[in-house]
A protein has these predicted regions:
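Alpha-helical solenoid repeat architecture
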Residues: 6, 16-33, 49, 58-73, ...
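Solenoid-like repeat scaffolds
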Residues: 10, 49-53, 92-96, 148-151, ...
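Non-catalytic protein-protein interaction scaffold segments in large eukaryotic complex-forming proteins
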Residues: 131-265
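Amphipathic alpha-helical repeat scaffolds of TPR domains
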Residues: 58, 62, 102-120, 155-163, ...
Length: 633
């Protein structure tokens, strides 16, 4: 090391020697431990400093590529925040079809993507602005590179070009959303035969729309009722009649208010909180509109309540004193949810679920404030409970499908297809797709969050099918039309608010459908790039299998499929880079939650479970196959 240091210091102006030093460093940097030491000794900025000299550039780029290739967070952050501008200048100075161009892109992409996860985006945007990094110029150059025929060098360059374009899009969302050329590039990803490319294109479009629109907010009863009383246009009336007007959310809310008023009228006379609790405790399992803020007309020092909603904690205590523990906990949990105390509701429901594990409401209350993976697992457990009301089933399916969507996008845009997380991501995506299909079949068209889910189903459908979709998307028209109608109904409900807060999944759906047909031809060269990129080759490995929709769907029967009385005929799509048995290995045998950390049955070694509770709930069914006289520990 000291010899290289001396050689560099004594010959800074001799490009032939500095180039030789850079070449030696490039070989040494193959070792991660040595790379870390060389970085600490200050060699990274030295390599950047000689990029301006053409005779040194090849070796310097190779050394920098090795530096970032080890994915050390501090090295990637250093390159992104201090040296990105000079590396991007190389990208501008050389022809796009050269190896130097590919190396510059690789360095920027490998440095930027990890940095996006370690620095808050607004802070990184400020750093890029301060360093005068020309994001638009880089993106335009990338588009030029991706639109040309595939160059002869390594196909990994396409992967890095896509990653760099995505990373820069996060730093310039307004620019990307307003520039047709960039949007079409990301939409064209959805025509690729490579699942990872499709997932990356879908995720960046969806994330940009979430940033612009914000997360979806649920409808409230007042807005639904107001829109219902004003009346709907003919095509929306048809949508509602086809489902059943008396089964829709508006009717449910109005009927719930009427029923609650009748209960309150009786209990205002006798103040029998036990009877009040029995009535609304059952109603809370059936509808989201079981209790309203009606005035409590007999307020006193003993009953200091302004509304009947305020009386719910007291009602729960009265029920407990009469050994009605389940209804008491339902009422208190619902009160905590209505008042925004989600974690307290979760904790209460978690304790109650140990006493009565087959009440689906507990899992609904628990899953809302949880992180994605825990929420999905909990929702899937709830969907296995018997006798679920449509209200609870809808809530569980909403959480399960949206959380599975987020987890699928994360898993399918990160690891290699040989990684366990990749198989888990495919399972998440399949589960999301089936749950969305189910909820759109069973739920009213004006139900909570349904517009977001209808548009999300279109995104999941396109992500799954990709290049198999016909050029004019003919087979997709029924689900697209349903999403359009439900979205129009949602627009009528949220008439004023939507002017400033559109639905993210709707924005993404409109962007994708606007360009998906045309990019098949206009971006054919880019699509060919993606079909032969390194990710695609990994997915098409010698040991890779391509399960059909029917095979993958079998993995999720019981949780989502059984939530519907009918199981519609499924179309075919392909998952690349995994085997059916490999997906099954990461799925709970009871609740069907995808996970890479499961406990196996100690007897047969085939069944896998999230935890002991799932194992116990599955035992009655599993013991006939397992042949064990008692549950394994």
């Amino acid at each position: 090391m000291a010899g290289l240091q001396s050689l560099w210091t004594d010959n800074k102006s001799n490009n032939r020697i500095t180039s030789g030093v850079a070449g030696v460093l490039g070989d040494m940097l193959a070792d991660a431990g040595v790379a870390k030491k060389l970085y600490n000794d200050g060699w990274l900025p030295r390599m950047v400093s000689i990029l301006q000299y053409e005779e040194c550039r090849d070796c310097a780029l190779e050394a920098l590529s090795r530096f970032v290739g080890h994915n050390f967070p501090d090295i990637c952050k250093d390159v992104s925040t201090n040296h990105f501008q000079k590396i991007s200048q190389v990208f501008f100075d050389v022809d796009t079809d050269t190896e130097d161009s590919a190396q510059a892109v690789r360095i920027m992409a490998k440095a930027l993507m990890p940095t996006l996860g370690s620095i808050e985006t607004p802070k990184l945007i400020t750093i890029f602005d301060r360093n005068k990094i020309k994001i638009k110029k880089i993106l335009d150059r990338l588009m030029e590179k991706l639109e040309n025929p595939l160059p002869p060098h390594s196909p990994t360059s396409t992967c890095h070009e896509i990653d760099l374009a995505i990373g820069l899009a996060y730093l310039s969302p307004d620019l990307v959303l307003s520039t047709l050329r960039y949007l079409q590039c990301f939409v064209a990803c959805l025509r690729s035969s490579c699942m990872k490319v499709r997932a990356k294109g879908t995720r960046i479009i969806y994330d940009l729309c979430v940033g612009r629109a914000g997360r979806p907010k649920p409808n409230n009863m007042q807005q639904i009722a107001n829109a219902w009383m004003k009346g709907y246009p003919p095509e929306i009336d048809t949508l509602i009649r086809d489902y059943g007007e008396d089964r829709c959310h508006a009717s449910e809310g109005i009927n719930g208010l009427t029923a609650f008023q009748e209960v309150v009228a009786d209990r205002t006379i006798d103040l029998d909180f036990y009877k009040f609790g029995l009535a609304i405790g059952q109603a809370m399992l059936e509808t989201d509109y079981a209790v309203f803020k009606l005035p409590f007309e007999r307020r006193s020092s003993k009953y200091p309540f302004n509304t009947w909603l305020d009386a719910l904690p007291h009602t729960a205590n009265v029920l407990r004193s009469n050994a009605e523990f389940d209804k008491a906990d339902i009422i208190e949990a619902k009160y905590l949810m209505v008042t925004g105390k989600w974690m307290a509701a979760k904790d209460l429901a978690e304790k109650a679920s140990k006493r009565s594990p087959k009440i689906g409401f507990w899992y609904y209350a628990m899953c809302i404030p949880m992180e994605d993976a825990d929420s999905l697992r909990t929702a899937q457990k709830g969907l296995r409970c018997p006798g679920l009301s449509l209200y609870v089933r809808h809530g569980l399916l909403y959480q399960a499908s949206t959380r599975a969507w987020e987890l699928a996008l994360k898993a399918l845009t990160g690891p290699s297809p040989s990684d366990q997380l990749w198989s888990q991501g495919l399972a998440y995506l399949g589960l999301c797709y089936q749950n969305l299909k189910t909820i759109l079949t069973i739920s009213p068209p004006d139900s909570v969050g349904i517009a977001s889910l209808a548009n999300l189903f279109v995104l999941a459908h396109i992500l799954l099918h990709g290049p198999e979709l016909s050029p004019n998307l003919e087979e997709s028209k029924p689900i697209v039309e349903k999403a359009r109608l439900i979205t129009k109904l949602n627009d009528l409900i949220w008439a004023e608010e939507l002017a400033s807060a559109p639905i993210a999944s709707q924005m993404a759906r409109e962007i994708i459908l606007k360009h998906l047909v045309s990019v098949s031809e206009s971006r054919s060269a880019f699509i060919q790039h993606t079909d032969s990129c390194a990710w695609a080759e990994q997915e098409r490995g010698d040991d890779a299998k391509q399960p059909t929709t029917e095979e993958v769907s079998k993995l999720f029967e019981g949780a989502s499929i059984s939530s519907s009385s009918e199981d519609p005929k499924r179309s075919k799509y392909k998952f690349f880079g995994t085997e059916r048995q490999e997906i099954h290995l990461y799925q709970c045998s009871w609740c069907h939650n995808p996970s890479a950390v499961l406990r196996k049955c100690g007897v047969c070694g085939q069944a896998c479970y999230c935890d002991q509770q799932c194992q116990k709930l599955h035992w009655k069914e599993h013991k006939t196959v397992c042949k064990s006289p008692e549950i394994s520990k």
